[in-house]
Every structure is written in structure tokens, then in C-alpha cells.
Amino acid sequence: MNFPWDQLLVKGNWMITMAQIGAPFLVIGLIAVITYFKLWKYLYKEWFTSVDHKKIGIMYLICAVLMFVRGGIDALLIRAQLTVPDNKFLESNHYNEIFSTHGVIMIIFMAMPFIFGLWNIVVPLQIGARDVAFPVLNNVSFWLFFAGMILFNLSFIIGGSPAAGWTNYAPLAGEFSPGPGVNYYLIAIQISGLGTLATGINFFVTILRCKTPTMKFMQMPMFTVTTFITTLIVILAFPPLTVALALMTTDRIFDTAFFTVAHGGMPMLWANFFWVWGHPEVYIVILPAFGIYSEIIPTFARKRLFGHQSMVWATAGIAFLSFLVWVHHFFTMGNGALINSFFSISTMLIGIPTGVKLFNWLLTLYKGRITFESPMLFSLAFIPNFLLGGVTGVMLAMASADYQYHNTYFLVAHFHYTLVTGVVFACLAGLIFWYPKMMGYKLNETLNKWCFWFFMIGFNVCFLPQFILGLDGMPRRLYTYMPSDGWFLLNLISTIGALLMAIGFLFLVVSIVYSHFKSPREATGDNWDGLGRTLEWTTASAIPPKYNFAITPDWNGYDTFVDMKEHGRHYLDNHNYKDIHMPNNTPVGFWIGIFMTIGGFFLIFETVIPALICLFGIFGTMIYRSFQIDHGYHIPAAEVAETEARLREARIKEREAVSHES
């Protein structure tokens, strides 16, 4: 084994040196706290090895929030560098590393786990399922994601981060990027991508096979519908990325030449592979976000969603078109007029089903009895801001005009107006909306609204000036500029906006901490003043019982739960409980994640033998699992009856309290 020790530490940058010093203390402090409070056994038994979809969802959300912080710090460093002209705060390569990691973290390690966390918590409950179709695979999927996340974040302090942009184009990411940085990108995303693909398959089967028998596809809640269609995109889009990452890994480690022109390779092959995955990836995070808005808007408008079936078809149309637009990411790379025209038209077409969704949300609001809780505020702010992102997207879809906009800050502003308002607003709204389902209490609404106003205003202050900067010719990925360029004032305003967004996020963190100690607990499950419209609100809070539903609920129409509440009925009115079979926890995913992390680390530094040993460890873990005789366990009917009696009693008390107040 010839490990490249000389590449291990990044030298010559004060910021990275401070991180290298601080990171070990942070890890030691975390270990000390867990040891002091004797939490190791609890965490391992109840969380790390859990196959309960709700606990796995919470672990995804914790990781997503942490990555939001990491990606947000990267964004603030970018804005700090560009605040004034000729700034020496960051040198050029460090700046390249920061904007490269910012993009990867926000898409792969923040937005996706945020969405997957909400999938895990909400979808099985919305369809009346006891668990996902493959509980053990669900645990493995999380630890594959976690392994990729850890590896990618190690790059900042060990070996150096990737600096070829989040798109990692060849040949820049090939012979022109020596060192382990790009290897971190390839291996971390590959491992995380395997977990994502497994999650897509798992939830596709879960929705198809585990939903309550009375629930028809066109009657499913929109969040579940968007999840189902998104899983199809995941299953179709991630294999090309897997192939592309594998090919570039062999180029860099085993000296193949798939993307090296001098040896007969083709750099444009990477661009096509990447964007065949990359543009559907946008809809992998956007479509579930649309589903979140489609749950929140009817709830706080006190109306059923307008045009439910048209929303389903619009979602399917967007998913189909998402695979026909990838070339619009490189109109300027010499494809020719015919190809550019085809992809220009297909890109514009995607605005039609998206417009259907926008009009349906507006018509849902029409004549609704709207209340402005913080999830609703994020949902309402999404509509006009996302519209601006969509309109500028249509502008970019015009191939001839794209020659002016391409690789300028106009493009940066466009995709932030789509991804931040479309995805981040939805993630924050969904977190607040379903937080009482997870924890049994609502986040403080005053602090939530401060979060919303700072974040929303800061977002527009930050990114609206970037449209003007782009039209004025400021290139993206530029680490500095001269005073004579005339970009100082707008960059200063943009940085102020980024600081306002950071303050808004801090209000959310304060809300989480404050609410943990101060918010009243609500055991009834229908936590938003009885406004819930779907099956997850029929179950108890916090964290519904492991079995979710004591009996299989009926779902005879989109407003089944609303009708039940209006007539004073509940699915628990049937008291004929039986023993419930549940799967046991398993350490398989946890240990596969450890082997993946260690093996991936050695492969990043091109040390193949230890990586192969870890690969054998993964196979050994899988063989161990295959020879286990594990039939799960049963929750006795008496225990189920006791649990459900407590929920029924809490609901009766709540109903009596409401009647007394009225």
C-alpha cells in the first residue's frame, strides 16, 4: 500500500488550517457529550439501526439542516468575496472550491435528503401503510447517503475540495485537476447516488403495493402522487449519472481515456451524461416540493385542491418533458441549429404543465377562508417568485438569446429563483407544517414568521440584482472584478440580501430550540387546529406508533378525512384489534455505511487494496444478513388497544374543549 501522505493536509490557507484544527475538537466534543449522557446504546439501538421509516426520515432531516448550514456558509463566503472589487479575502482556487462544493451540497446533500426525509415521514402515513415496502433497504439507503455526505465534507480539510464546478466538466475535471479533490466529488456522489436509487425503488414499490386497498391512484394526496412520479424519474435518471461517475473515476484512477481528447476520448460525452441526469434531477427536488405546496395551500385555504386530476397529469407531463430538455444547458457548445431548436421548443413546452399547476393553486385560494400561518406564507411567496424564475427560464430557452445570457449572473439568478423558491421555501414550509407530526408540538409561529420575512426579503434583495449584473456582462464563477467594471453597488446589495437570509435561517434555529422547551404538547395528531385533510393527521403525535395504523384505514375520496371529521367519525371507531407484525431493527445498513466511508476514502486517494478489503467487508455484511433468520416481532393486540385508547381519549377531550369554547 502506497498511501499519498503528502496530499493529506491542505496547506497555505488560513481558513482551511483553522477548520483542520477545529474539526477534531468538534468531533471529540460530540463524542464526549454522547458518552457523558450515556447515549451510545440508545442511539445505536433506537436510531442508527432503526428500520422505522419515521425515525429514518428524522435522521435525513437532521443531516439536511446541517448541510443547509454548511452550504449557507459557502454562500456567505462567496458573497463576502464579491462584495467589493479586487478583493483578496479568498484566492482564486479556494473560491473555485467553495462555489463547487456549494452547488453539490445544496442539491445532493441538502435538498435531496430534505425531500427524502419528508417522504419517509409522510408518505407511508398518507397512504395508510404500516411501513415502506423494504424497511432494511430504507436503512441501508440512509447510510449510503450519510457515507457520501461525510466523505464530501471531509474534502475541505483533508486533501482539498473539488474545484471544477458542481457540473465537473471534462477536461477541467480530468488532467487539469490533479489531486484528490475531484475524486471526492466522484466517489461521494456515487455512494450517495446508490442510496438515492435504492430509495426511489423502495418508494415506488411502497406506493404501488402498500397503500390502503380502497385508495385509487387519482385519489391519492398530491404529495404522494408527486413522490410516486418522482421515483420514476429517480429510477430512470440516476443510472446515467452512475455510469458517468464510474467512467470518470476509471479515467482518473486507472488511466482510461473516456473523456480525454488526446487519447480518443470525448469531453462532450460527460456533458450529455451529466445533464441527462442533471435536468431531471431538478424535477426530482421540484416535483415533491410542488406536492408540499399542494398539501399546505388547501389546508390553510380550507378548501379541497382545485383541479386535482389536472395536477396529476401536469406532474406526469413535467416528468416526461424533463428528459427532453437537457441540451439547453449547453446551447453554446456547437450542437447546430436543428438540435438547439428542438430542445428550445421542448424547454418552452415545460412551462405549460407548470402553468396549469400555478393556476390551480391560485384557484384553490379563490374564495378560500385563508389564514396566514408560516407554512402558508412560504407557499404564497413561492407563487410570484417562482413565476419570475420560470419566465427567465423561458428567456434562457431561446437558443439565440442564450448566447447572451449563458454563463452570466443572469443564469445564476434564474436557477436560484427556481430552486430556492421552488425547493427551499417548500422544505422550510414542509418542515414547519409536519414538525408537530414528528415532535408532538408546533414550532413557535412568531419566530417562524420572522424567519419567513427575513428569508423571503433577503432572497429578493440578494438575487434580483444578479439579473441586472448578468445583463451587464458579469460572468458567473468570477472570483474578483475591477472597480472599472461598475458592479460594486449591485454586488454589495446582493451580499446584504444573503446576510438577511442567514438571519432568517437563524430565526428558524431559534424557533426549534425555543419550541422544544416552551411549546405545548399536542397528542391528538391533527395539530393545525383540526385543519388536516389527509391520513397522516389521523395518527398520534409525536412520532406515530411503530405500526402507524391499528387497522387499515378506508380512503374513498380525496376528502375522506374531512368528511369523517364533519360527521364525528374516526377510523379508530373499529375496536377489533389484532396482533401487528413488524420488522426488527438491523445493523446491516450502519456497517455497510462504515465500510463504504472507509473504502471510499482510500479509493479517493487511489489506494486500491484497502478499498477492495472494505468492498469484501460490504459483501460479508450482505452475506451475514442473507443467512439471518429474522421473522420480525409482533405487537400484541392488547398493547395496540391501549395505545389507540389514549389517542381516542385525547381526541374526545379536544372535541369537548372545542365545543365548550364555541
UniProtKB/Swiss-Prot annotation:
Cofactor: Cu cation; ferriheme a
Sites where the protein binds Fe(II)-heme a: H102, H416
Gene3D superfamilies from the UniProt entry: Cytochrome c oxidase-like, subunit I domain
Membrane topology classification: Multi-pass membrane protein
Residue spans crossing the bilayer: 14-34, 58-78, 103-123, 140-160, 187-207, 228-248, 273-293, 311-331, 336-356, 376-396, 415-435, 451-471, 493-513, 587-604, 608-627
Matches recorded under Pfam families: COX1
PROSITE patterns noted in UniProt: COX1, COX1_CUB
EC number(s) from the headed UniProt entry: 1.10.3.-
InterPro entries: Cyt_c_oxase-like_su1_dom, Cyt_c_oxase-like_su1_sf, Cyt_C_Oxase_1, Cyt_c_Oxase_su1_BS, QoxB
Residues reported in the UniProt entry to bind heme a3: H414
Functional description taken from the UniProt entry: Catalyzes quinol oxidation with the concomitant reduction of oxygen to water.
PANTHER family hit by this protein: CYTOCHROME BO(3) UBIQUINOL OXIDASE SUBUNIT 1 (PTHR10422:SF35), CYTOCHROME C OXIDASE SUBUNIT 1 (PTHR10422)
NCBIfam families linked: QoxB
Descriptive protein name: Probable quinol oxidase subunit 1
Organism encoding this protein: Staphylococcus aureus (strain MRSA252)
Lineage, highest ranks first: Bacteria, Bacillati, Bacillota, Bacilli, Bacillales
